[in-house]
Swiss-Prot record:
Gene Ontology, cellular component aspect: cytosolic large ribosomal subunit
Protein name: Large ribosomal subunit protein bL19
Keyword Ribosomal protein among UniProt keywords: yes
InterPro entries reported in the protein's UniProt record: Ribosomal_bL19, Ribosomal_bL19_CS, Ribosomal_bL19_sf, Translation_prot_SH3-like_sf
Alphabetically ordered keywords of this record: Ribonucleoprotein, Ribosomal protein
Disulfide bond sites: none
Top-level taxonomy: Bacteria, Pseudomonadati, Pseudomonadota, Gammaproteobacteria, Moraxellales
One record GO biological process: translation
Pfam families: Ribosomal_L19
Function: This protein is located at the 30S-50S ribosomal subunit interface and may play a role in the structure and function of the aminoacyl-tRNA binding site.
Length: 122
């Protein structure tokens, strides 16, 4: 049980998104972000590897890292934010850590992640 007031808990539960896919650190995802430019709004895609995930109910967040023109770019997204329009899992990664911060020090082929293969049917 969380130490939150039942009213606060009820309001937070009403704000949670339910259409989110299952994803984990190591997965390659495309995050569609709503960007407001002047009076119009458009979707901007941010594709990269999930290097960290923080599960805290409404305060859940995840960090995505990509290499853009030779420079590493990391962006932290609030999972249930209205700014995040859609999350699409491109590739499942097979990793043994919950936080992949060691990828910050690796570049090129060393930073590759094995793909998780679907479970075999017995």
């Amino acid at each position: 049980m969380s130490g939150k007031h039942p009213l606060v808990q009820a309001i937070e539960n009403s704000q949670l998104k339910t259409d989110l896919p299952e994803f984990a650190p190591g997965d390659t995802v495309v995050v569609q972000v709503k960007v407001k430019e002047g009076d119009r709004e458009r979707l901007q895609a941010f594709e990269g590897v999930v290097i960290a995930k923080k599960n805290r109910g409404l305060n859940s967040a995840f960090t995505v890292r990509k290499i853009s023109s030779g420079v590493g770019v990391e962006r932290v997204f609030q999972t249930h934010s209205p700014v995040v329009a859609k999350i699409e899992v491109k590739r499942r990664g097979d990793v043994r850590r919950a936080k992949l911060y060691y990828l910050r020090d690796l570049s090129g082929k060393a930073a590759r992640i094995r793909e998780k293969l679907p479970a075999r049917k017995a």
